[in-house]
Amino acid sequence: VRATLERFAGAYRAAGAPPVVSATKGFDETTLERMTEILAELWRAEHPAALSGPSIAPETARGVPTAVTIACADEARARRFQELFTGDAFRAYTSDDVRGVELGGALKNVIALAAGICDGLGFGNNAKAALITRGLAEMTRLGVALGAHPQTFYGLSGPGALMVTCLSPQTRNRPAGERLGRGEGVAHLLGCS
C-alpha cells in the first residue's frame, strides 16, 4: 500500500492536495500504520478522512441500501463528504473519531477469520455468536487502549462492519477462515503452493 501511495504523492500534490477519504480497512503490513496516518505522512494530506461500515462492494455497486460512517478530524470536511456520498441508497453518517472508525474497519477482519474457522470446524451458530460478541468486546478494549472513543465501536464501523464481514459469504475473511477451519493450509489459501 505504501509503495502505491508513494507513486501517487506527486500527482496528489500537483492536483492541489484536495480533501481525501480512505475506504481501506486494514493496516500497513510493515509499519502497522492506519491508512490516514500514511496519507498524512506521504501525501501531506490535511485531515484525511476514513470511511467504514457494513458495505460489501458488490452490494453497494448494485444500489442495495448501505450505510457507513465517514470520520474526519475536521467536522466541516466530514459533513461535506457526507453530502457528496449520501444518495438514495447510500447513507453516510459522520464522526470525528478517525482512529476508532479505522480500527473498527480493520480489527473486524480478525474476528471474521475466527468466525469462518468456527464454521469450518462445524462449531455451530452458538459458538460463532459468542465469538463475534466477545470479539466486539476485545475490539472495543483494544481500540480504547489505542485512543479511540468507545462509542465508535457500537456504530456502523463496529458491529455493523463486524456483522456483515462475519456473516456474508461475499467477504474475503470469513470464507478464508472457513477454509482454514476445514484444514486448508495458509500457503494454499494464499496461492503460494
PLM segments and residue spans:
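Internal alpha-helical scaffold of NAD(P)-dependent oxidoreductase catalytic cores
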Residues: 4, 11, 38, 42-46, ...
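Glycine/charged-rich beta-loop-alpha catalytic/anionic-binding loops adjacent to active sites
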Residues: 18-20, 97, 185-187
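A generic alpha-helix surface/boundary motif
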Residues: 33, 136-137, 174
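Rossmann-like NAD(P)(H) cofactor-binding subdomain of soluble oxidoreductases
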Residues: 1-65, 81-83
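NAD(P)-dependent Rossmann-like dehydrogenase/reductase catalytic/cofactor-binding core
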Residues: 108, 112-119, 144-193
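Short coil/turn segments at secondary-structure junctions
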Residues: 23, 123-126, 187-190
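Glycine-rich beta-alpha junction loops
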Residues: 25-27, 52-56, 74, 96-101, ...
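Glycine- and other small-residue-rich loops at beta-strand/loop junctions that grip anionic moieties
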Residues: 49, 70, 165
